[in-house]
Amino acid sequence: MEKRLRLAPSPTGLFHIGTARTALFNWLYAQKIGGKFLLRIEDTDFVRSKSEYTKNILEGLKWLGLKWDDEILKQSDRISIHKSYIKKLLECGAAYRCFTTENEISELREEQKNKGLPPKHDNRHRSLSKEEIDSFISQGKTSVIRFKIDEKIEIKWVDLIRGEIKWQGKDLGGDLVLSRRAKGYEIGDPLYNLAVVVDDNFMNITHVVRGEDHISNTAKQILIYEALNFKLPTFSHTPLILNNEGKKLSKRDCVTSIDEFRDMGYLPEALSNYMAFLGWSPKSTDREILSLNEISEIFDLSDINKAGAKFSWEKLNWINSQYIKNMESIKLSEIIRKYWDDNGWVAPSQEWAHKLAILIRDSMILLKDAIDQSKPFFLIPKIKKEGQDFLENNDSKASLRLILNYLIEQNAIKLNKEKAKEIINEISKMHNVKKGILMKSLRVAFFGSLSGPDLIQSWELFSESKTDISRIERCFKSI
């Protein structure tokens, strides 16, 4: 039998990291067991669902490299089918019409609150006669359709992450609402728990992997599966992603959407790698940098922890920096060129861009760090006080003059790393000047301070862009 997993997001907001991790776990397990990863858009909330959010979800999945199989199923296309199953449940006596008003429900909740009881519907219309139903309808009252839940029943299943889970019918909040706003003898608008069961059955889903906040929904849905004689899938409930305070990560924690992570400069490979370890602890490896394919080979739902997983910026940043360091210079230069273009910076040549990418990548945590790391190679930096103080020393100023004179005398010299070292050594021996003084003086001329990237590699780049002499001359004018 073909194994089939699915992601079923609601397009009511931007693609969130919690949904993205659920997608990742489903995709990884589908790859591991040779199954399919399917996508269903649950867009039946016509007020909050928006096409731009659907587009955002699809783009986010593609960016993360999580390719889905088969055509996308839109839940809104299946409303008539959902209604037909609610009708079946009505006809077999598993569901009924309830005309309780919002005011009556509010009064009931207030009464329960005053008594210290949890909120729970009292199922007051479970046994209405046909005449009573007709009377409510003739008065123009709308109804909801509720699914009967036996309070004495025990629902249990074996969760692939949490083991056996038991739930009592009396703890499910009363009879479950399947649809709302039913006028007359109509069915109304089908709701989540019914639609999910019907659509998962239609898609032949064998494994449902979702967040632990759905555990109570699973108990309710199992009862609907059984009432409709549908085959139960295997359920797995992943831990929540937590903030530093141990609370569920939310929009109040600032960055939560995949768009925001991308715009901040995180690589999709790095974010996927990090998300996989948010709650997953593989027994077969201690490695922390793994590609999606490598993870899928060892991924197992049983290795996912039950406890919530704390989100760590420090860890994500480290993983992202590792991916940047190990990226091919050609690919990295193509990516960071976009940042250069945004700032109006033009690389003298493709080879020059590759060399600069190699030079700065070890100092980068985020892709956007390329802006600050590259800036001194495109714009002349202001000389900082530490640089000014250093060059006020006569030896330092004289050392810089020696380098400038040498470069002017050797007009049109083709400078590479070896030649740069040779120049430093030659001037040092010829004029009895310490190499350290020469190099620090040159660093101030290039970067305006005593710190910066590798000097020799930088000099090669400044020489290729024909800016090394002009920077040294500019340095003399400013001191």
Curated annotation (Swiss-Prot):
SUPFAM superfamilies per the UniProt record, alphabetical: An anticodon-binding domain of class I aminoacyl-tRNA synthetases, Nucleotidylyl transferase
Disulphide bridges, residue numbers: none
Role: Catalyzes the attachment of glutamate to tRNA(Glu) in a two-step reaction: glutamate is first activated by ATP to form Glu-AMP and then transferred to the acceptor end of tRNA(Glu).
EC number: 6.1.1.17
InterPro entries the UniProt entry points to: aa-tRNA-synth_I_cd-bd, aa-tRNA-synth_I_codon-bd_sub2, aa-tRNA-synth_I_CS, aa_tRNA-synth_I_cd-bd_sf, Glu-tRNA-ligase_bac/mito, Glu-tRNA-synth_I_codon-bd_sub1, Glu/Gln-tRNA-synth, Glu/Gln-tRNA-synth_Ib_cat-dom
Record lineage: Bacteria, Bacillati, Cyanobacteriota, Cyanophyceae, Synechococcales
Domain of life according to the entry: Bacteria
Entry GO CC: cytosol
Source organism: Prochlorococcus marinus (strain MIT 9215)
Family according to the record: Belongs to the class-I aminoacyl-tRNA synthetase family. Glutamate--tRNA ligase type 1 subfamily.
Keywords: Aminoacyl-tRNA synthetase, ATP-binding, Cytoplasm, Ligase, Nucleotide-binding, Protein biosynthesis
Reaction(s) catalysed (UniProt annotation): tRNA(Glu) + L-glutamate + ATP = L-glutamyl-tRNA(Glu) + AMP + diphosphate
Assembly: Monomer.
Gene: gltX
Stored Gene3D superfamilies: 1.10.10.350, Glutamate-tRNA synthetase, class I, anticodon-binding domain 1 (1.10.8.70), Glutamyl-trna Synthetase, Domain 2 (1.10.1160.10), Glutamyl-tRNA Synthetase, Domain 3 (3.90.800.10), HUPs (3.40.50.620)
Binding site for ATP: K251
Keyword Plastid: no
One GO process term, biological-process aspect: glutamyl-tRNA aminoacylation
Enzyme class: ligase
Entry's localization field: Cytoplasm
Protein name as it appears in the record: Glutamate--tRNA ligase
Extent of motif 'KMSKS' region: 248-252
Motif residue range(s): 'HIGH' region: 9-19
